[in-house]
């Protein structure tokens, strides 16, 4: 497809960046509350909860989901925290938000009987995954993340699309073990595979797969109850999200439990649903991009219409998807003329 010049988008700059060293980095009339309206409103609330600033007051009760022997998920602490606690020590995948991390760590100690966290994975740089870093770094915890995540945590992020700023972490609270290529860790009789899913939600997202338990921690690459958050401030985009979900599908079988960044543990069928939605919306937006449509014109065209009852309010998702695809037209099959 050939690209016609898009009409100007009246929205403010989205704060797009090219990598961790980029300096910019990072009312309608009331209507009856029918089921569709309720779900759209719920979806908006879920997205908003993912984008709360680091100083937000959150007192959601913590809940626990058992996943097997010495393996459980804590929810309600800003983001899902996966806890594996063999005799060798406690291993966490994500650490909750700064506001709730003390509550999360206290519950971990009470549930496991262990005082020290041996290993912490940061699945990406966002505040609700890295809230425990500043505490755990003082006790010698190994903090593992992709190198891009460490780089983002070392700069002040100005996320213009959210109209929020996120301060850098102190140097000692940043990941102390980083990687680029897929890795495997043996710990407590379990084998954990972890690797990057490029530009799926940010440019540093990783999965952590516990082979024996058959539990796949997907974090915010997988979305429940809302359209995926494409963090354009750190290079997330719709094709990256689709590629990430497809990578997770290849790792899964019918019995795999999928741990998202927020929301309930999912069956593998959820990956199929997210991939199908992303594929359809991406194709529709590519056609509109080739016709030179703006972000608002794409929103008005309702490319997500049949999915909204499940995924919620699509406006921010479409707007961020537009920002991503407009920077990568050739990867969308659109040639510039």
Segments the model singles out, each with a brief description of its role:
Residues 110-184, 203:
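Active-site HxH/HxHxD metal-binding segment of metal-dependent hydrolases
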Residues 32-88:
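Zn-dependent metallo-beta-lactamase
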Residues 12, 16, 21-45:
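N-terminal secretory signal peptides and thylakoid transit peptides that target proteins
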Residues 89-90, 97-99, 184, 191-280, ...:
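Metallo-beta-lactamase
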Residues 286-297:
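Short, charged, surface-exposed loops that flank catalytic or proteolytic processing sites
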């Amino acid at each position: 497809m050939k690209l016609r010049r898009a009409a100007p988008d009246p929205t403010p700059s989205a704060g797009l960046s090219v990598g961790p060293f980029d300096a910019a980095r990072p009312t309608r009339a009331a209507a009856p509350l029918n089921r569709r309206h309720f779900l759209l409103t719920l979806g908006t609330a879920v997205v908003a909860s993912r984008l709360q600033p680091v100083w937000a007051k959150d007192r959601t009760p913590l809940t626990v989901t058992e996943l097997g022997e010495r393996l459980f998920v804590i929810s309600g602490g800003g983001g899902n925290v996966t806890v594996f606690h063999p005799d060798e020590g406690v291993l966490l995948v994500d650490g909750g938000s700064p506001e709730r991390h003390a509550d999360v760590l206290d519950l971990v100690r009470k549930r496991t009987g262990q005082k020290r966290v041996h290993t912490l994975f940061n699945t990406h740089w966002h505040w609700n995954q890295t809230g425990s870093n500043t505490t755990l770094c003082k006790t010698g915890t190994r903090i593992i993340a992709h190198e891009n995540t460490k780089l983002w945590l070392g700069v002040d992020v100005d996320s213009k699309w959210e109209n929020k700023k996120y301060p850098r972490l102190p140097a000692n609270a940043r990941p102390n073990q980083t990687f680029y290529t897929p890795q495997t860790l043996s710990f407590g009789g379990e084998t954990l595979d972890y690797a990057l899913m490029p530009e799926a939600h940010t440019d540093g997202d990783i999965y952590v797969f516990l082979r024996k338990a058959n539990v796949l921690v997907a974090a915010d690459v997988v979305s429940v109850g809302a359209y995926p958050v494409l963090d354009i401030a750190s290079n997330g985009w719709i094709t990256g999200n689709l590629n990430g979900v497809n990578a997770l599908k290849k790792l899964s079988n019918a019995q795999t439990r999928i741990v998202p960044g927020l929301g309930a543990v999912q069956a593998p069928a959820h990956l199929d649903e997210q991939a199908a939605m992303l594929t359809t919306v991406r194709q529709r937006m590519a056609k509109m991009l080739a016709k030179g449509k703006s972000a608002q014109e794409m929103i008005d065209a309702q490319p997500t219409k049949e999915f909204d009852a499940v995924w919620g309010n699509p406006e921010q998702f479409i707007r961020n998807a537009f920002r991503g695809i407009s920077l990568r037209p050739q990867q969308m099959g659109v040639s510039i003329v």
